[in-house]
């Protein structure tokens, strides 16, 4: 398995602000930032922040004491489903297990995806 080595979120945000000061961030999801993406929207190239789907869901579970299903539903409706213009972040599915627990129970891959 290839290791994942990402810059610290504050470094990514600093660089993104230099490239695109209009880029939007998802509140409270800084730990899920994995980089900067270049996207084509509305006839132009834009640099936006890229988040890990699993990282955002894990963050929602920790911050709100939610189970996986609640965090995933909130993410689907209120986060990934919210397009607010060309500077909207993107969310990348890293195809990895969520290593979070809820009340002592490990969240398993089969709880995340249909195989």
Regions found by a protein language model. Name each.
Residues 2-115:
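C-terminal alpha-helical interaction appendages
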């Amino acid at each position: 398995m290839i290791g994942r080595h990402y810059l610290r979120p504050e470094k990514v945000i600093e660089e993104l602000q230099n490239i695109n000061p209009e880029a939007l961030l998802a509140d409270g999801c800084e730990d899920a930032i994995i980089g900067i993406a270049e996207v084509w929207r509305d006839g132009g190239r834009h640099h936006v922040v890229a988040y890990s789907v699993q990282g955002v869901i894990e963050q929602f579970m920790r911050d709100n004491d939610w189970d996986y299903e609640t965090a995933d539903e909130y993410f689907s409706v209120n986060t990934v489903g919210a397009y607010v213009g060309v500077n909207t972040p993107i969310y990348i599915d890293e195809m990895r297990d969520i290593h979070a627990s809820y009340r002592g129970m490990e969240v398993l891959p089969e709880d995340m995806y249909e195989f």
